[in-house]
Amino acid sequence: MRRLVHFVFAAVVVFGFLVIQPSAAQESANPGLSLSVVGIGAKDYADSLNFYRKVMGFRPAFSFSPNGKTHNTYFQVSRDTFLELQEAAANPTPGLTHIHMQTGDVDAIVARLRKAGVAPCSATLKTGCISDPRIAQPTQEKSATIVDPSGIRIEPTQFIPGSLTRKAVDSWENKSAATRLMVVGIAVKDYPESQNFYEKLMGFRVAFKFSSPDGQRTTTYYQISRDSFLEMQPVAADGAPGLTHVHIQTEDLNAMIARLRQAGLASGARNATTPNTVTEAGVTQPSNVKSANVFDPNGIRLELNELLPESLTKKAMESWK
């Protein structure tokens, strides 16, 4: 018999934002997934390779050339989270490309989602669907592909023995690493349809949501796992649906900003968006997170987050069951 979970929400107004936050008693859906990889399409691969390795300080876990012409490098942000840098070929437009969500059982995820109503992808159904499981090459991971209603690609991925990601996880020795891939942002074209997809079909818990001061836009944080989230916003009038930015958690934001400036990143004002810069630190409202933005050579935004005691993300983590 399917268990019904009742949700109780508290509404709080913070700096003009209406924040709706689940009560501490809300139970976790625990869909068996966690954010593990976000893909980056680079305009200048060599420049981006230097940026992520020497400036950001991320370890190159492994590299490969899928077609003998373009290149991919996996950078290890933490023991089990990665950024996948890809050399743009046919489409030179830089940006974030796709999401991997780690699972211990891809077959079970596919079966659960199909039972929930996510249809198999086909020649005539290319969004709001999921593919059959496969062994991805050359990484040797077991994975499937979900395409959400906006065309965003999500790959449930199993780090099976012998896969390149499993080898990278097992060989991780950086005990002092203080960074982790925590949030990926998406912009969707049909907000209610996407809400239905992520809440009812994917089974993600609403960690918290808030509306813009004018009430015209809603941002929803879905909790994928205890410490990883999907941040969903409606696409801007002049924009296209897709991935918007990532959040990287750090234990000491000021120290990380100082290290990045020492590594050569120019300082930027809080609202600056210039490539190869890091902005001043501030507290983002209404999530109450200490943050700064890094813009890579392609203009891709990496939001550095230090979780304060009253941060909404920290509260969501602490209430995860």
Could you describe each region identified by the protein language model?
Residues 30-33, 39-82, 108, 115, ...:
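Core segments of cupin and vicinal oxygen chelate
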Residues 47, 102-105, 158-160, 165, ...:
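Generic signature of mature, soluble extracytoplasmic domains
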Residues 8-19:
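Bacterial N-terminal signal peptides
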Residues 59-60, 81-84, 92-93, 108-109, ...:
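Short loop/beta submotifs within extracellular cysteine-rich repeat domains
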Residues 3, 23-31, 33-44, 73-75, 89-177, ...:
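Vicinal oxygen chelate
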Residues 193, 199-255, 262, 268-270, ...:
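Structured core of small recognition/catalytic domains
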